[in-house]
């Protein structure tokens, strides 16, 4: 025997159960002779061992855990050469001869469990992202995982991991959340029905977060509740505010009844907040994180806007029935927080190449060099990174979500400087694109607010990988978008995919603060920060706008600075928060903020 050396998140059930301390009869029914059969057989044995000795399985020995049900989450195989979706299948087993589970529960109950969960999944997917999602039906078959557990059991085959049309959805974090919530709702409804009680579904995360100073040593945090259009019971009743000071951990939270929270602060300390919504059904996922700091010797206050909301699957393409796939080198997508499922780049794009062997899997085949690695995604915590650099430069800062700004809940004109975080924000579709594309860098409402802010003398710093490509090369070009970039922010698009080196060097300009700054940003997949595969090449537009940075390998413009009579702008074609070292982030932020305050030096 030899250990794999792989992380435990890749571990099969058989070895996880052994490591967790379960007896050999549970994790290895074959007594060590067959890992493959042990892996699928041990799951049902594990369920029975957990429940053994409890009220639901009193005649067996075990850990006395009164389980309500067992649920096995699978994906299936199967391909189509077009946009057809394989879809979802439910499997249960009502038994041959034995019509009840351990405590005389009818085995027919498993059919009801399967039906309610499968119905919830299909209904929610069809209502949101894919009206043609295929509900394949329900099978009453003697699969080991369905037959052996002595409690109501369902096997779900959610989609085909082998089919491109299915995986366009399956790789998207938004779809994963929707399906996971649907499964949770289906199980909740089943348990409530079995026990004859009313249920309530946990709320969705709150949005519209914003912070403000209401005194020298006090701040106010506000947000909005989010109703669930798919579930009327998921209404928030209260909220929990979690606080982090500096780079410490978040506290255990403060329960509040309203959609606002005030707190005393200590100057020169960075405070960060995230909020969850709660009701009798449970607690929502956390909101994005907003941060702030009151500097005791402040030069001014910067408003940081988090406009990086995107989570999505990798870029994908299809050429009729001939070729299709995911182009992770162009855009890996954006995982929610992190991803552990990516194994490597796809290399076989020909639809007609069949599966021959697991080592020659045909269409969709991918490399295996990332099987053991964790890939960083969107942490929704970037105001903190920007804020550290801002406070290092001597400025206080507040932060807000972009929706709070576009809904005019934040008065930008109260702040001399704005820092807009765009990260890898860009317009993307989900699946085959039935619904409108999401995550536009500069929606019309934001353009209007930024234009008004600039015309009233504001200074704005914007950084993001698609600050220009999303306006010029998105498949649906809008001349108004381009005019906004040209005439308000004073930059123009040169090219997407401008660099692969991850290195930026200074360019000759009238702004001496940038003359010696070299920057290196994350351009490959890693566990610390999301990667920028395709930064933007941008150029200055109009009088007073100059290139201040270029990409290291080709001299394509990476950043511009505009000094006008009424306002200033600084635009970067790569995200500021992806810069690898805090020293480089501090130096660049200081150069930007100080240049906003200085008179232009003519060459």
Regions found by a protein language model. Give the residues of each.
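Pro/Thr/Ser/Gly-rich low-complexity, intrinsically disordered linker/stalk tracts
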Residues: 190-233, 281-300
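A glycine-rich, often tryptophan-bearing local segment used as a flexible ligand/cofactor-contacting loop or short
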Residues: 424-532, 545, 552, 588
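Short, surface-exposed beta-strand/loop micro-motifs that present aromatic residues
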Residues: 142-147, 535-538, 548, 552-568
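Beta-strand-rich modules
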Residues: 262-283
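Short beta-strand segments within Ig-like beta-sandwich modules, predominantly Fibronectin type-III
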Residues: 251-258
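Helical hinge/lid and interdomain linker segments adjacent to catalytic or ligand-binding clefts
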Residues: 343-479
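Active-site-adjacent mobile loop/cap segments within catalytic or ligand-binding domains
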Residues: 54, 69-99, 128-196, 573-578
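Catalytic-core regions of hydrolytic enzymes
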Residues: 1-86
């Amino acid at each position: 025997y030899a250990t794999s050396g792989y992380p435990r998140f890749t571990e099969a059930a058989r070895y996880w159960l052994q490591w967790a301390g379960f007896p050999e009869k549970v994790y290895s029914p074959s007594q060590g002779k067959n890992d493959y059969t042990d892996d699928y057989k041990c799951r049902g044995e594990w369920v029975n061992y957990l429940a053994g000795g409890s009220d639901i399985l009193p005649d067996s020995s075990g850990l006395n855990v009164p389980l309500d049900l067992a649920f096995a989450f699978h994906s299936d195989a199967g391909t189509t050469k077009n946009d057809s979706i394989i879809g979802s299948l439910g499997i249960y087993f009502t038994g041959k001869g034995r019509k009840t589970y351990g405590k005389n529960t009818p085995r027919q109950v498993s059919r009801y469990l399967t039906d309610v969960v499968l119905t919830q999944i299909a209904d929610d997917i069809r209502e949101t992202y894919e009206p043609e999602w295929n509900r394949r039906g329900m099978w009453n078959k003697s699969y080991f995982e369905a037959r052996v557990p002595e409690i109501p059991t369902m096997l779900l085959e959610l989609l085909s991991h082998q089919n491109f049309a299915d995986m366009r959805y399956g790789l998207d974090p938004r779809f994963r959340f929707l399906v996971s919530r649907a499964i949770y709702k289906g199980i909740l409804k089943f348990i409530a029905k079995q026990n004859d009680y009313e249920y309530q579904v946990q709320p969705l995360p709150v949005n519209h977060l914003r912070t403000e100073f209401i005194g020298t040593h006090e701040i106010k945090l506000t947000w909005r509740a989010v109703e669930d259009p798919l579930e009327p019971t998921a209404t928030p009743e209260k909220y929990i505010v979690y606080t982090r000071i500096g780079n410490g951990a978040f506290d255990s939270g403060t329960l509040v009844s309203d959609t606002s929270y005030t707190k005393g602060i200590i100057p020169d300390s960075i405070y960060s907040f995230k909020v969850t919504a709660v009701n009798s059904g449970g607690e929502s996922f956390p909101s994005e994180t907003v941060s702030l700091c009151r500097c005791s010797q402040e030069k001014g206050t910067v408003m940081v806007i988090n406009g990086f909301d995107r989570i999505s699957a990798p870029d994908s393409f299809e050429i009729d029935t001939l070729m299709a796939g995911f182009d992770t080198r162009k855009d890996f997508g954006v995982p929610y927080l992190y991803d552990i499922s990516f194994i490597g780049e796809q290399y076989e794009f020909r639809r007609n190449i069949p599966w021959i062997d697991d080592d020659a899997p045909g269409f969709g085949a991918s490399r295996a060099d990332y099987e053991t690695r964790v890939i960083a995604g969107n942490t929704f915590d970037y105001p903190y990174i920007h804020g550290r650099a801002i406070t290092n430069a001597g400025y206080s800062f507040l932060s807000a979500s972009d929706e709070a700004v576009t809904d005019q809940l934040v008065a930008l004109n109260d702040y001399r400087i704005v820092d807009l975080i765009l990260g890898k924000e860009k317009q993307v579709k989900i699946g085959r694109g039935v619904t409108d594309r999401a995550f536009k860098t500069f929606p019309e409402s934001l353009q209007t607010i930024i234009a008004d802010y600039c015309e009233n003398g504001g200074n704005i710093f914007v950084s993001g990988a698609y600050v220009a490509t999303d306006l010029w090369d998105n498949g649906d070009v809008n001349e108004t978008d381009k005019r906004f970039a040209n005439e308000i922010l004073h930059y123009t698009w040169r090219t997407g995919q401008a660099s692969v080196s991850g290195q930026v060097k200074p360019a000759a300009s009238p702004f001496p603060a940038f003359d010696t700054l070299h920057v290196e940003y994350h351009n490959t997949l890693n566990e610390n920060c999301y990667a920028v595969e395709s930064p933007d090449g941008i150029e200055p537009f109009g009088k007073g706008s100059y290139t201040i940075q270029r990409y290291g390998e080709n001299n394509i413009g990476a950043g511009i600075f505009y000094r006008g009579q009424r306002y200033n702008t600084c635009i970067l074609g790569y995200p500021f928060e992806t810069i690898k070292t805090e020293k480089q982030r501090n130096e660049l932020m200081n150069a930007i903020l100080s240049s906003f305050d200085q008179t232009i030096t003519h060459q």
